[in-house]
Amino acid sequence: LDFDRTDTGKICLTDEQTGVPVTENLIFRAARCLQEDTGCGLGANIHLHKRLPMGGGLGGGSSNAATTLVGLNALWETALSKQQLMTIGEKLGADIPLFIFGQSAWAEGIGEQLTAIELPPVWYLIVVPDAHVSTGKIFAHQGLTRNTHPIKIRAFLERGGSNDCQAVVESLYPQVKEARLWLAQF
């Protein structure tokens, strides 16, 4: 993301490939929320250089919104605290506060209650199946149950966790299941 401050009060967002209408883009919405919540009359020209695949489940949109809040807070000199930025971010998406938090954290509630945790270093292999997984579609799906017993930090650190969305995602996007099964053989 590139940010240029303007005195016009307008938010102009350009991107290379998302195809999302500007007013629905989390970057634009984050900038607008920051303006409204602070009464800031400044604007910005924002350019997105998209590198993560849309619908890949990697939090790209939420990370971009968090970066926008943090970046424009500095650029516009609105002097909001990290906690205030996290509160604005929560209005836009449950995982946005995590990206503002800026370190590994245990999330509770809908993702807004964060506790810093230390995690051992790990390596990740990212496989990108030919699927655009819609977060909204997954969370609205009838098959996504809300009856999972909460797990505590200690149990997670000792035994790991699970992904409640996995069964729904794999039923709607078989190519995701194929990729997981392929990885499981190693």
Regions found by a protein language model. Give the residues of each.
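Glycine- and acidic-rich phosphate- and metal-coordinating loops
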Residues: 40-56
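N-terminal beta-alpha supersecondary unit
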Residues: 1-42, 148, 154-155
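Glycine-rich, charge-dense phosphate/pyrophosphate-binding loop(s)
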Residues: 30, 39-40, 45, 86, ...
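Alpha/beta catalytic cores of group-transfer enzymes, especially the acyltransferase/condensing modules
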Residues: 78-133, 174
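DPxDG-like acidic metal-binding loop motif
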Residues: 56-82
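Residue-level signal for inorganic ion chemistry
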Residues: 1, 27, 61, 127, ...
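A short core secondary-structure module
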Residues: 130-145, 153
